[in-house]
A protein has these predicted regions:
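Nucleotide-activated sugar donor-binding and catalytic core shared by glycosyltransferases
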Residues: 1-11, 17-34, 40, 44-51, ...
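Nucleotide-sugar-dependent glycosyltransferase catalytic domains
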Residues: 3-4, 28-229, 233-257
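Glycine-rich His-Gly loop
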Residues: 9-12, 233-235
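Short, solvent-exposed coil/turn linker segments
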Residues: 219-220, 267, 339-342
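Nucleotide-activated donor-binding/catalytic signature segment of Leloir-type glycosyltransferases, i.e.
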Residues: 226, 255, 266-284
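Glycosyltransferase donor-sugar binding loop
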Residues: 234-235, 259-267
């Protein structure tokens, strides 16, 4: 029997993109899907077959210290989440009341979801685009900076703002006070084999892995040939002209063909003379480029990591946030690539990439992880899990 399934996802590519193949699969099976997010992703949501519920939800550029994310950086980011939540919660609540769904599926990174699910008595599930947490693995500890200080004034301001949000919107404080709260059903878009402490997760968690062949793009980009190095710091934290300049020094006038995505924050003129073997753009069609790349120099956002592993492309990671640091450390731990230090030099950068290219252990591990991704189930498996969950809760 067809159901109404409502999605709420933060307007960030790394969180939206993993859900769209699932949405398309649910629509294909005859379900009605509504999807609330910011306007920047409206076309993608509609293309997946969902009805867009457009929210006044635009992510702000995230700034971090060049030595790595600090407690103040984290507090500033979390406070912006609270401000966004205050702005969009009334519209989200009205939508859920006026068009009550059979199942409410929300992004694990927004507390609006569990807060309103509890307030309105909705059947709920979460989507997890990064690591999941449980009683055995403390996700919060993995996602905070190394210098995390809970007594920092800016972090205390965030805690106060979060408590005020719960009071003003009449939602249980515990639903907004826990990072990555565990829902009764949690869809995790990574394979269990990549998950930290993966063996400890029970039936509340379905590890679907990334959707295979999910993102395609019409583009004028064509591969310049091998060896191809793809460089990107993602879409959220990429204002690093110093890093991109280091890359130009490391790989300029070498045998590498380099595709380097610098985002919208960096001015191309600030990078100085561009080497002839570099193709520099704000963004590239990442899934297409990774089909041809020999190495991916990445910020280690989870979506990027999964797409790299799916294509068996070794990773040189240069994380910008604590969340990305956890991903980068896992890549290194599983010998799928190597993590670079914050103060990386051109010589070290070039040596690391060259080493990754010829490391047979990494190649073997990439093949094994790609096999795990292919057997995880992807969007069809995630849709099966949601339908079974709905059937158990009729």
């Amino acid at each position: 029997m067809a159901k109404h399934i409502a999605f709420l996802t933060i307007p960030a590519a790394g969180h939206i993109n993993p859900t769209l193949p699932l949405v398309a699969e649910l629509v294909r099976r005859g379900h009605r899907v509504t999807y609330a997010t910011g306007p920047a992703f409206g076309d993608a949501v509609r293309a997946a077959g969902a009805e867009l519920v457009e929210l006044d939800w635009e992510p702000k550029a995230i700034k971090v210290a060049r030595t790595g994310q600090t407690t103040e950086d984290l507090a500033r980011m979390l406070s912006s989440f609270v401000n966004s939540a205050r702005r969009v919660t009334p519209a989200v609540e009205k939508w859920l009341v006026d068009d009550r769904p059979d199942l409410f599926v929300y992004d694990m990174m927004t507390f609006i979801g569990p807060a309103l699910a509890a307030k309105l008595g909705l059947l709920e599930a979460s989507t997890v685009a990064n690591f999941a947490g449980n009683e055995h693995f403390n996700l919060t500890q993995a996602l905070v900076p190394a210098d995390f200080d809970p007594t920092h004034p800016k972090f205390q301001e965030f805690l106060a703002a979060r408590a005020q949000y719960a009071k003003d919107f009449d939602v249980p404080l515990e639903t907004v006070a826990t990072a990555g709260a565990i829902a009764p059903m949690n869809l995790v878009f990574i394979p269990r084999e990549f998950q930290l402490s993966g063996e400890t997760f029970d039936g509340r968690f379905h590890f679907a892995g990334p959707a295979i062949g999910a993102r395609t793009a019409v583009s004028d980009w064509t591969s310049p040939g091998s060896p191809l190095l793809f460089i990107s710091l993602g879409t959220a934290v990429n204002d690093r002209p110093d890093f991109f300049t280091t890359c130009a020094k490391a790989f300029g006038n070498t045998n590498w063909n380099v595709a380097m995505a610098i985002g919208n924050e960096v001015n191309l003129a600030d990078l100085g003379e561009i080497p002839a073997n570099f193709d520099i753009r704000p963004y590239f069609p990442q899934p297409l480029v990774l089909q041809h790349a020999d190495v991916f120099l990445s910020h280690a956002g989870m979506n990027s990591v999964m797409e790299s592993l799916l294509n068996q492309v070794p990773l040189a990671t240069y994380p910008q946030t604590a969340e990305q640091s956890a991903n980068a450390n896992r890549v290194t731990e599983l010998a799928l690539g190597h993590r670079l230090p914050n103060d990386v030099t051109p010589d070290l950068l070039r040596a690391t990439v060259d080493k990754i290219t010829t490391d047979e252990t990494i190649r073997k591990n990439l093949a094994e992880m790609a096999a795990h991704i292919h057997t995880a189930g992807g969007a069809p498996g995630a849709a099966d899990a949601l339908e079974s969950y709905l059937a158990r809760n009729r």
